[in-house]
Design a protein with these regions (language model features):
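N-terminal Rossmann NAD(P)H-binding glycine-rich loop of SDR-like oxidoreductase domains
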Residues: 3-23
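NAD(P)H-binding glycine-rich loop region in Rossmannoid oxidoreductase-like domains
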Residues: 39, 45-90, 98
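Catalytic helix-loop patch of NAD(P)-dependent Rossmann-fold dehydrogenases
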Residues: 86, 119-164, 185-188
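Conserved Rossmann-fold NAD(P)-dependent oxidoreductase catalytic core, especially the SDR/UDP-sugar
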Residues: 90-134, 157
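Glycine/proline-rich active-site loop of Rossmann-fold NAD(P)-dependent oxidoreductases
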Residues: 140, 154, 165-175, 209-221, ...
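NAD(P)-dependent short-chain dehydrogenase/reductase
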Residues: 149-195, 200-202, 209, 238-239
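Mid/C-terminal beta-alpha module of Rossmann-like enzyme folds, strongest
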Residues: 213-275, 308, 312-315, 325-328
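Amphipathic terminal alpha-helices
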Residues: 290-297, 302-335
Length: 335
């Protein structure tokens, strides 16, 4: 295959490019900075300089591919709505504009966040129902743009991904360790809510399977672990893997939301980032359940990595890298 990937320096995009190159596919990846360019070169793929938020010659380069995987996004629990829309919506529009009258397979990486945080069971066919957070709204709007392009003839699939973690993960372990160092870990609610996570290798396997099969325009897939443990179990796995102890303190969701609201007010006044956001609280207390039944049937896909083993491998990776190369705790990534 010839594949063009946006977000080639991001967590998912970079892992995908590496896997594609190992399999011998021709890959070009969009890189918006010299650092991103260097990361793409490390994978043995061809970097294409450009930014999805700015139309340019990279749009013609995207047509090189038999498959285009749109992995670039701004992912964060905090930030101006205009910035989420600039990257996630306008960026998607730019890549779609470049692919008009192109006859390849477009794979749009979306998120289970398009459903917001309303408790319930969701399937691949459940419509987006965002929760007024700019990240959720922007991902839902990006899906709408893809659906419009499909009506105009684009061959496109959409992939809703759960919370991703694994070696190379920019946030998961770093943020967790911040709490451990304080001696206390706060969890929203009783901790019996599903963790809704998926290991990076399982995501990449799913994306490869989608890329290799004939496109069913408009088909949505969900990549999530169907038997992921609850949040409290996740915390216990991580503490065990780190060989650390910390007091686990459940906090009622209404209290957590109130604290986060105050943090956000202070941050707006101080023009700084809050240590806790309402989005993070709702995500941690999320009681949504996601079915992957259709995805499994169509792709023959199922997660190979248990969450317990996945957490252990992530911790092992984190311990091996030097402190200077460890990721920051700021959960924002525009790749």
């Amino acid at each position: 295959m010839r594949v063009f990937v946006t977000g080639g320096s991001g967590f998912i995009g970079n892992a995908l490019v590496r896997r594609l190159r190992r399999e011998g596919h021709e890959v070009r990846a969009l890189a918006r900075s010299e650092r991103a360019k260097a990361m793409v070169i490390e994978t043995d793929a061809i970097p294409v300089r450009g930014d999805i938020t700015q139309p340019g010659s990279w749009q013609d380069e995207a047509r090189f591919g038999d498959v285009v995987v749109h992995a670039a996004a701004l992912v964060s629990d905090w930030g101006p709505r205009r910035e989420f829309y600039r990257v996630n919506v306008d960026g998607t529009k730019n890549i779609l504009d470049g692919l008009k009258k192109w006859d390849g397979h477009f794979i749009h990486i979306s998120s289970i966040a398009v459903h917001g945080f309303r408790p319930g069971a969701y399937t691949e066919t459940s419509p987006a129902s965002p929760d007024r957070h700019p990240y959720c709204d922007s991902k839902a709007e990006a899906e709408r743009l893809v659906d419009m392009a499909i009506k105009e003839g684009l061959q496109a699939s959409l992939v809703r991904i759960a919370g991703v973690y694994g070696p190379g993960d920019p946030h998961f372990i770093a943020r967790f360790l911040d709490q451990v160092r304080s001696g206390r870990i706060f969890i929203v609610g009783k901790g019996d809510q599903p963790s809704n996570l998926i290991y990076i290798d399982d995501i990449i396997e799913g994306l490869i399977l989608i890329a290799k099969r004939k496109c069913e325009p408009g088909q949505r897939y969900v990549l999530s672990h169907p038997s992921a443990p609850d949040v409290l179990s996740m915390v216990q796995y991580a503490l065990k893997g780190l060989k650390l102890r910390a007091r686990v303190q459940p906090v009622p969701i209404w209290i957590a939301v109130a604290v986060a609201s105050l943090q956000e007010i202070r941050s707006h006044l101080a023009k700084s980032r809050p240590s806790l956001t309402r989005y993070a609280v709702k995500a941690m207390g999320n009681r949504c359940v996601f079915s992957t039944e259709v995805t499994a049937q169509k792709l023959g896909w199922s997660p190979k990595m248990s969450v317990q083993e996945g957490v252990a491998r992530t911790i092992s990776w984190y311990r091996k890298i030097s402190p200077s190369r460890r990721p920051s705790t700021t959960p924002a990534q525009h790749s």
